[in-house]
């Protein structure tokens, strides 16, 4: 695969500690699974999704550019709304995320791209 540019998304599951404290680890597990399903539904066809640990995920989108940012935002928002209405639960799953774009001219490691995306979280 020839990758000239792309995007790396750093995703944080909002309020996991509160969900764990209020609904127990079962609720926390359900929130993590739902967060993963949101990302899978949004990006599985053209990206690579991984759980970094705890409440953090990363999504690698090869060959994406800044023109795709609004599409990325829309996908995450649409899938979050869908999964929050699909199953009625006592809490909503919300994601915060930052996007780091790169191209073949940048000399950045994956860690540097993740750190850059983490700083972009809204």
Regions found by a protein language model. Give the residues of each.
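Conserved long alpha-helical elements within nucleotide-processing catalytic cores of c-di-GMP signaling
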Residues: 1-7, 14-44, 50-54, 58-59, ...
């Amino acid at each position: 695969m020839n990758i000239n540019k792309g995007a790396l998304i750093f995703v944080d599951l909002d309020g996991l500690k509160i969900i764990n404290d209020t609904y127990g680890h079962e609720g926390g597990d359900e929130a993590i699974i739902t967060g993963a399903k949101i990302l899978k539904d949004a990006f599985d066809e053209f990206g690579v999704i991984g759980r970094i640990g705890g409440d953090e995920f990363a999504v690698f989108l090869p060959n994406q550019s800044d023109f795709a940012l609004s599409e990325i935002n829309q996908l995450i928002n649409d899938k979050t709304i869908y999964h929050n209405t699909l199953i009625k639960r006592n809490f909503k799953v919300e994601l915060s995320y930052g996007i780091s774009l790169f191209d073949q001219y940048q000399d950045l490691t994956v860690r540097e791209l993740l750190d850059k995306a983490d700083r972009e979280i809204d």
